[in-house]
Amino acid sequence: MRIFAHMEGRKRIEVVAAVIRRGDKIFATQRGYGDWKDWWEFPGGKMEPGETAQAALVREIREELEAEVCVGPLLQTVEWDYPAFHLTLHCFWCSLATDALHLLEHESARWPGAADLGSVRWLPADEQLLPLIARTLKR
């Protein structure tokens, strides 16, 4: 399923994000830089030319968290217009293949459950995923 909120003529950026699940909680990170500093997101980043979404996600999690993930099924693709660009965000369910996570690029992190997802300020594109994630975590 795709969510669209699109305006033509903007720079287009394609990224991947890991919704890392551990039991009834997911891993969330707080941005430590840029226009969206202090907002929360799912870890991940830009895809490189010729790279699959899954390979990009494995690489990005290594770079951002010094961790290994097992990439599961696609949760959802979100299309979102930010003020300066159009974002295509491919979000995958993931699990950790390593125990330790090290924040190399983020300010903070937490493991919210379904009831806690609304307790932080999410980036707009990431926020679109919360209802689906909450329903899944409650099962």
Please give the residue ranges for each predicted region.
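Conserved Nudix-box catalytic region and its N-terminal flanking loop in Nudix hydrolases
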Residues: 22-63, 67
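NUDIX/MutT-family hydrolases
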Residues: 93, 102-133
